[in-house]
Regions:
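Short active-site neighborhood of thiol/selenol oxidoreductases, capturing the structured segment around
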Residues: 58-69
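Structural micro-motif
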Residues: 110-118
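Anionic-ligand binding region
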Residues: 43, 47-56, 60
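The canonical Cys-X-X-Cys-His
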Residues: 72-75, 117
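Typically the conserved alpha-helix immediately C-terminal to a functionally engaged Cys/Sec
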Residues: 76-88
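Thiol-based oxidoreductase modules, predominantly thioredoxin-like and allied folds used
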Residues: 90-104
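N-terminal targeting signals for export/organelle localization
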Residues: 1-45
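Non-catalytic, surface beta->alpha helical segment in thiol-disulfide oxidoreductase systems
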Residues: 119-154
């Protein structure tokens, strides 16, 4: 009987952890603008990505910077979602970066898993991030929260 209780308890804990992980996957987390505004110049500069670092132009409204790896299946799904959004809304850009080729940026932004997507404003400042596979709903919510005027203005 005690073994059965232990097995049931372990299954309950594993299920709870799995549901928690799934709920967090791909969810948008905004960067607090008051922290950036009050940060020293060198820290604020670290939260900005330039066209040279990206190797591509910034979107007029927002840019999704997706950090991926070659063997990452969720990265391909996230790429498809973001590419579709960019094709549907003017002023958006999507840049995919291989983590192996951009270790400096991986360290700078604390990328711990792929895919991780940073959302940049029109000036290249990181305004939010999504860790894990991103679906359309989470990507649209990120734009709504970060773009002046929301998605309808994009």
């Amino acid at each position: 009987m005690p073994r059965l209780v232990l097995v049931v308890a372990l299954l309950a804990v594993a299920t709870a952890l799995g549901l928690w992980w799934r709920a967090r996957n791909g969810r948008y987390t905004a960067v607090d603008p008051t922290l950036l505004a009050s940060a020293p110049a060198d820290v604020a500069d670290d939260s900005r990505l330039t066209v040279d670092e990206l190797g591509a132009p910034l979107g007029a409204r927002a840019t999704f910077v997706q950090f991926s790896s070659e063997v990452c299946a969720p990265c391909r799904r996230t790429h498809a979602v973001l590419a579709q959004l960019v094709s549907e809304h003017e002023g958006l850009s999507h840049v995919e970066m291989d983590v192996v080729e951009h270790l400096d940026l991986v360290r700078r932004f604390g990328i711990m898993r792929t895919p991780t997507t940073l959302l940049l404003d029109a000036h290249g400042v990181v305004v939010g991030r999504m860790s894990g596979a991103t679906d359309r709903r989470h990507a649209l919510a990120a734009l709504e929260a970060s773009c002046p005027g929301g998605v309808s203005a994009v």
